[in-house]
Design a protein with these regions (language model features):
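Short beta-strand "wing" residues that participate in macromolecule-binding interfaces
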Residues: 20, 56, 161, 417-418
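N-terminal small-domain helix-loop-helix segment of the aminotransferase-like
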Residues: 78-171, 350-353, 416
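N-terminal basic, amphipathic alpha-helical segments
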Residues: 1-123, 327, 331-337, 349, ...
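Conserved glycine-rich beta-strand-loop-beta hairpin in the small C-terminal domain of fold type I
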Residues: 363-373, 383-396, 411
Length: 451
């Protein structure tokens, strides 16, 4: 109830119906009007004061703060200030009101996560190892977890691994950052999918890399363009989502994968396979790490997407010598992943909770994907492909010629999108939109997408 009252008052401020300096009802009147307790009314006003939307004046009551500025629906002050930055569209996803339909986001809805099971494992973790609460962990990562990851990847990718080939990280973004620091020097030419994960492009540019986008087709990278680029430039590495590609949802074919690896071998190219959405798939796999046997492919995975964004644990798999160098870099930059988080993942992998959770999530994703694809088809939208699982579909409409204006229209209708240009390797305009089917509701989405 508190959140609802706060949200309602913020909406009135943003709509200009409550103006700077205007007096608000007393706490008792607010409680009586909304049928809430005195304590709830007090808490609501306290939150609004803390956020700077209203001010309290001793003996007079509560007033709309004279410095409060109307904001776009669902937007926090941080998001409003940052919306014109290169990553501005993504601020809406992180700071928008819970009432918004966040179709542009890259995570599962909170309701899809078994928070009760997670809470049980958290309690078990705390009881199992008190030292994990206060001590530094191993820079390579918690050994039992790395051993479990070896078994996990043997089942998934048929890879025979030793624990010294696995390094834990603070999620996949941290893994990519470590690899970029180790493999890429300023001025190096680096390849990425186009479109691709926008965080990756920003990390590479921060390093001073020359980023070249390889157009993504339904069956994988454009091999002709890939070959031409390798012949033209001394390329250092190729960062790729082979399966359940972000943002298109496409997966590489066996033929495309074999030809890509052949060209990589010919040009002595290192490939970094970012596979954070692996466990959302339907089982079919042409993963490069599996086909290559980790000769020139470095594999990145994560549990942040599937389990919890707060308990961030990712990992890198590669040759032991490379992993040792990454561990040194990790030690310099952050020492170790929090031991509590590593033990949490270790327990949840070992007791069957993780697999049960995946079965449930995969079923929901299949159902929502089918609903979303059918709805977009009826509304006249074109889908890039029909994904083999995962949470994304990539769509466009011939009548939507101004994507940025369409995104703004979505905000006004309570739907948060990210324009396709945000996923472009070089920021070029794009008519496409990434849709997270896990957040899709046909009735709510129709107010924007039904043309």
């Amino acid at each position: 109830l508190t959140a609802q009252i706060v949200s309602r008052i913020e909406q009135l401020i943003d709509a200009g119906k409550l103006r700077p300096g205007q007096r608000l009802p007393s706490i008792r009147k607010l409680a009586a009007h909304h049928g809430i307790s005195y304590h709830t009314a007090v808490t609501a006003y306290e939150q609004l004061v803390a956020s700077g939307r209203i001010s309290a004046q001793q003996g007079r009551g509560f007033f709309i703060d004279s410095h409060a500025q109307p904001r776009q629906p669902g937007m926090s002050s941080v998001a409003s200030e940052s919306e014109n930055s290169p990553l501005g569209s993504f601020w809406r996803l992180f700071h928008g009101s819970p009432e918004l339909m966040k179709l542009g986001c890259g995570w599962l809805p909170p309701a899809w996560r078994d928070t009760q099971a997670l809470a049980r494992v958290i309690r078990r973790t705390a009881n199992f190892s008190k030292s994990a609460l206060v001590e530094y962990g191993d820079p390579l990562g918690y050994l039992p977890l790395r051993q479990q990851l070896c078994l996990h990847l043997q089942r998934k990718l048929s890879l025979i691994l030793e624990p010294q080939q696995v390094l834990t990280t603070l999620g996949a973004t941290h893994a990519l950052d470590l690899l970029i620091r180790l493999l890429v020097a300023p001025g190096d030419h680096v390849l990425v999918d186009d479109p691709c994960n926008s965080n990756l492009v920003q990390l590479l540019k921060l390093r001073g890399a020359q980023v070249i986008g390889i157009p993504r087709r339904i069956d994988g990278p454009d091999l002709a363009f890939f070959a031409e680029t390798l012949a033209k430039w001394p390329v250092k590495a190729f960062f790729i989502n082979s399966m359940l590609h972000n943002p298109t949802g496409s997966s590489i074919s066996a033929s495309n994968a074999f030809q890509l690896l052949r060209l990589a071998h010919l040009h002595d190219l290192t490939i970094v396979e970012d596979d954070v959405y692996a466990d959302f798939g339907n089982g079919h796999s042409n993963r490069l790490a599996m086909l290559d046997g980790l000769e020139r492919v470095i594999y990145v995975g994560s549990f942040s997407k599937t389990l919890s964004a707060s308990l961030r644990v990712g990992y890198v798999v590669g040759p032991a010598r490379l992993i040792a160098r990454l561990a040194d870099l990790k030690l310099l930059t952050m020492v170790a992943v929090p031991g509590f988080c590593e033990r949490f993942v270790s327990i949840i992998l070992g007791d069957g909770t993780y697999q049960r959770h995946l079965v449930s999530v995969q079923h929901k994703l299949r159902t929502h994907q089918a609903m979303a694809l059918e709805a977009f088809r009826q509304w006249g939208w074109e889908a890039f492909c029909e994904p083999q699982g995962g949470m994304f579909v990539w769509v466009r409409h011939p009548q939507v010629t101004n994507p940025e204006a369409f995104v703004q229209e979505g905000v006004e209708k309570g739907i948060v999108l990210v324009p396709g240009s945000a996923f472009s390797a070089d920021g070029q305009p794009s008519p496409w939109f990434r849709i997270n089917v896990a957040h899709f509701d046909a009735t709510g989405a129709s107010v924007l997408f039904k043309r």
